[in-house]
Amino acid sequence: TNERHKHCELGFGQGVSLNIHAASSFGLFFGTDFNPAHAAHANVLAEQNQVPHHFYDASFEELLNKDLPMFDSISLHGIWSWISHENQHIILQFIRKFLSPNGIVYISYNCLTGWAANMPVRELFHSHFKFNSTSTNPLQKVNDSLNFSEELLTQNPLFAQRNPNALNKVQDLKKQNPNYLIHEYLNQDWQCFSFQQVVRILEEIKLTYAGSTDLNSHLDN
């Protein structure tokens, strides 16, 4: 068919991967990122590559109310676990409204199975960052919170005795870029989901699980 497939990415960040796809395929790409600087960067890349594009700095609710085509695919990477229940509901409405029959949704999220052991560490880190650090500098607050968490766990409380990797996790976090940690761990909204939870949520809007996009998981060796 000569008809162009249409794709939409919710929360495209700097828009790099979105532009790569737009430049290397016959599809027509739409997307939004609430950060105006991110959206501006994505649009500059698209204009430099001379690819048709529709990139916005709209909220999910604003995008829901736009006059948009039906999409063959809708993607959200690094979004679902870091937004409010209200925004999750809006995204479900968006998918139900704009996904073509037989369309595909790609969704990534923090999986409970992998995160369960580190959730108390994140809660300790986040609580000190939000309530106890005396600094007004976010990067210093990250360092203060990690130092506090490390000092607490080195006292070998019962939690650390039962979860010996907790201290190692904090020490690993201290090696990370503080800006990354703010985004990854310190959002106001932060949730983990089991696989079955996500399946049930998406079944409510008539989606059926198709498979993992990690190609390695489909190989025997």
Label the predicted regions:
Residues Q50-F60:
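Conserved SAM-binding strand-loop segment of SAM-dependent methyltransferases
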Residues I107-T136, K141-L158:
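Conserved class I S-adenosyl-L-methionine
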Residues P157-N221:
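Rossmann-like AdoMet/SAM-dependent catalytic core
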